[in-house]
């Protein structure tokens, strides 16, 4: 299969669904299967584009993670970790609880990203899509925010070390990409850009615009924190004002894009007020940046997104569609997909690609929120330009 790849490689295997903490946990990889089947049923994804993830080696994991942490994850995989050790490594709560074979399943997510990196760097694919990845909260020595191994950071370091690539990470998840940021805070070969809901009210509490890197990494960390209840127009305006100057100045060889879709107003864990309009526009703009500045080299990841029935499948489908230069979809979803999954869904499935917006609430403070966001975005853009002079 991998000898006859089209320009876009799409990572999928049912093995990726095994990254699962417990049945009631908000992080549910069934969203990946729902998205993949939607794309297949709509004849937008072909089986020839699908590649299998490999399992990342310990040495690859330790490009970012500490040896003792990787060993602790292995112990937790078999239920032989002490309570003190679990607490030390962030594995003792509902957020990042232990599950069987967690090391292997987590390393498979990382391996999926590295598979794409090798395909792109060998010229067998131009770009890649790994919606099962995007675990941006994992720290070098601690699990965090539903994330065990940080596949994004590992892939960035792998590309930098193995292929001498300058890597730009663009993260549009509602939560700040803290694990990725801190992994490269003093690095000038990897630049991290994150636009997110302000940490004043949302996990992980970081991502202030004054977090800008240190030592040779100063100016290689860019954060754009937005106010709660930010709507589409403000999110997209601030994103475009701040991200292209970073790409243009840093001159990356490749972009890693984190496409959390929890900025949607229906997401149960966040407070932003965006719709599918933003979630459809964002990946297409990032694809434009890759086409313009990196000769099209880009890997698009998944990320957050906890309304797995009404939001994630349609939004993530467009992450892939942006890579294959297909237009934004409209009209009815495939009946085959609806008829299969309506028996499993906890809520009424959408019938169309578009949001109905029948339950959308317009916030009275929209103007004030947008003005505050724009003022900050302009300040960040001005600061960034000054660091490049």
Curated annotation (Swiss-Prot):
The record's GO molecular-function terms, alphabetically, read: histone deacetylase activity
Q: In which pathway does it act?
A: Ketone degradation; acetoin degradation
For whether the record's keyword set contains Electron transport, the answer is: no
Q: Which InterPro entries match?
A: AcuC (IPR003085), HDAC_PDAC (IPR050284), His_deacetylse (IPR000286), His_deacetylse_dom (IPR023801), His_deacetylse_dom_sf (IPR037138), Ureohydrolase_dom_sf (IPR023696)
**One Pfam match, by short name?**
Hist_deacetyl
Q: Which residues form the signal peptide?
A: none
Establish whether keyword Cell membrane is in the entry: no
GO BP terms? acetoin catabolic process; epigenetic regulation of gene expression
This protein's UniProt keywords: Acetoin catabolism
**Which family is this protein grouped under?**
Belongs to the histone deacetylase family.
**Cited function:** Role in growth on acetoin or butanediol. Involved in the breakdown of these compounds used as a carbon source.
The name of this protein is Acetoin utilization protein AcuC
């Amino acid at each position: 299969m991998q000898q006859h790849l089209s320009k876009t490689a799409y990572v999928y295997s049912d093995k990726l669904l095994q990254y699962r903490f417990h049945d009631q946990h908000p992080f549910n990889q069934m969203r990946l299967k729902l998205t993949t089947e939607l794309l297949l049923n709509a004849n937008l994804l072909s089986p020839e584009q699908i590649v299998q993830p490999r399992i990342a080696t310990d040495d690859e994991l330790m490009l970012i993670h500490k040896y003792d942490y990787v060993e602790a994850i292995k112990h937790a995989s078999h239920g032989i970790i002490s309570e003190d050790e679990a607490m030390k490594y962030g594995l003792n709560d509902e957020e990042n609880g232990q599950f069987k074979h967690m090391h292997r399943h987590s390393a498979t997510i990382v391996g999926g990203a590295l598979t794409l990196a090798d395909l792109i760097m060998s010229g067998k694919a131009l770009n890649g899509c790994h919606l099962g990845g995007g675990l941006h909260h994992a720290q070098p020595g601690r699990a965090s925010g539903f994330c065990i191994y940080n596949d994004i950071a590992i892939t960035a370091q792998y590309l930098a070390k193995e292929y001498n690539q300058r890597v730009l990470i663009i993260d549009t998840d509602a939560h700040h990409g803290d694990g990725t940021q801190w992994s490269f805070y003093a690095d000038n070969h990897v630049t991290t850009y994150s636009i997110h809901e302000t940490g004043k009210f949302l996990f992980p509490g970081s991502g202030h615009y004054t977090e800008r890197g240190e030592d040779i990494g100063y100016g290689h960390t860019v954060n754009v924190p937005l106010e709660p209840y930010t709507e589409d127009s403000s999110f997209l305006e601030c994103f475009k004002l701040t991200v292209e100057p970073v790409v243009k100045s840093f001159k990356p060889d490749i972009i890693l894009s984190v496409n959390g879709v929890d900025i949607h107003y229906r997401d149960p864990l966040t407070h932003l007020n965006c719709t599918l309009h933003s979630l459809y526009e964002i990946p297409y703009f990032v694809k434009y940046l890759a086409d313009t500045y990196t000769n099209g080299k880009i890997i698009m990841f998944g990320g957050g997104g906890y309304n797995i029935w009404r939001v994630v499948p349609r939004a993530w489908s467009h992450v892939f569609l942006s890579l294959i230069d297909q237009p934004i979809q409209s009209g009815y979803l495939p009946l085959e997909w609806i008829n299969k999954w309506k028996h499993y869904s906890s809520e009424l499935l959408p019938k169309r690609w578009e949001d109905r917006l029948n339950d959308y609430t317009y916030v009275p403070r929209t103007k004030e929120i947008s003005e505050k966001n724009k003022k900050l975005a302009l300040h960040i853009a001005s600061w960034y330009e000054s660091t490049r002079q």
